[in-house]
Amino acid sequence: MKKLSILLFVVFSLQVNAQEPEFGLFIGNTYYIGDLKPYSHFSQQDFVVGGIYKNNLSNGRVAFRMNFLYGRVKGNDFESGVEQQLQRNLSFRSSIIEIGPVIEVNFFPYKKGQFETNKEGFGTPYFFGGITYMRMNPKAEYEGEWVELQPLSTEGQGTSQNDNKPYALSQISIPFGIGAKLNLSTRLSLSLEYGLRKTFTDYLDDVSGLYPNQALLAQEAGTLSAALSDRSSSPEGFNDSNYGLQRGNPNNKDWYSFSGLMLTFSLVKKSSCPTW
């Protein structure tokens, strides 16, 4: 809640010089980069949808917007084609709620309502950056049901094996990327955007550290925790051959991408005709 309050303060502070408000929709696709998919951009994609509130400053060079987005990311060792990951056999999906301010900087002056292609201000490329509150919730499929992973302490967090507290589901991320926008009419605008998010957690996929002792984990955190901690184990019982080995790479934080189309509607009708 404290993180969200700070973001809202930033939002209202930036409204002082804002002009030309817009509301809009965002729809697109997602992917993640992390321990289960360390290198492959654009694979194992999922969806993102949400709402946008935007203000274009009167100079035509800068726009401020507030994102309210809901998306989902996923990763699966089985789809990696890497032998070590195939043996590890972990998978996850996580919903992401994202709320936060973003600043767009236009390459060329952009005029809301100017939809004549032969005139300045019709459209422009832009780049953007900001800061967002994100809420994640990694889950894994087990016996036909999706199970929340954070409460299970799959790496022994909060047990006698691991002094670390369970990781936080609420985080801050840094969105940035590029896009292009154009006016469709005096009120409608369309943008195409590619964005990455840098996070400060390595647990978007619930994978980061070492394999715990599975028998002890089952005793202290439950058999379900042990079953989802090491999915390379045989179904007949717990296999502690991986105990103490690297389950993930704690030195690399997780990333995700939200990319797609934005359709925005201006609250103030802007004429494309010159005034006399």
Regions found by a protein language model. Give the residues of each.
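Extracellular loop and loop/strand-boundary signature of outer-membrane beta-barrel proteins
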Residues: I33-S40, Q84-F92, G113-F115, T159-P166, ...
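Predominantly the C-terminal beta-signal and adjacent terminal strand-loop region
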Residues: S185-W276
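Short glycine/proline- and aromatic-enriched beta-strand/turn motifs that initiate or cap beta-hairpins
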Residues: Q19-N56, P138, D254-G260, T264-K270, ...
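Outer-membrane beta-barrel channels and translocator barrels
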Residues: L57-G60, F108-Y110, N183-S185, V268-K270
